[in-house]
């Protein structure tokens, strides 16, 4: 169709450092609640990432077979690297397509799909094992889990990878990430900032789990009374 009508197709692809995508992707599976990954434990998932596409280079090459590399615009999904007027995903995307970010653009909801992490993800994962096939019930418990995430203790800021796990996990994709930097971004510097977030590694036995369980089920009861 593009050749027939004499127009050019450009593909914009945002890629995220693989460890961040891992938690975000599993969080989405758990929130959906009905698929085969909705009850998988984090430790099992991060050791064997199943069908998730973390090798971005192979994915880009498949797209390039259709469009050509020159028509693929690779952007890094990292708040520290977003470009444009206010350094958000919105301004970055508009810059990528050559549109000025003016006051005519109204962002109504900046973070509508916040990920579940640690305790809130684990609680919902376990609840998923007994959930009925009822959209209303699934929505209720998902919202309670999101409240659990939103109102958790500020000190409940565990990391999901130990240093050893992080290095092993990211090492799987090192050569492919280097290839993207070279072939698609034409740069020598690394594709991602490889500084790992410091902190205590999350485990289900952490000191905040009890209060998060109470918060979750309290949220379920309150929502049922509305």
Language model: regions and residue ranges:
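Anion-recognition interface
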Residues: 1-226
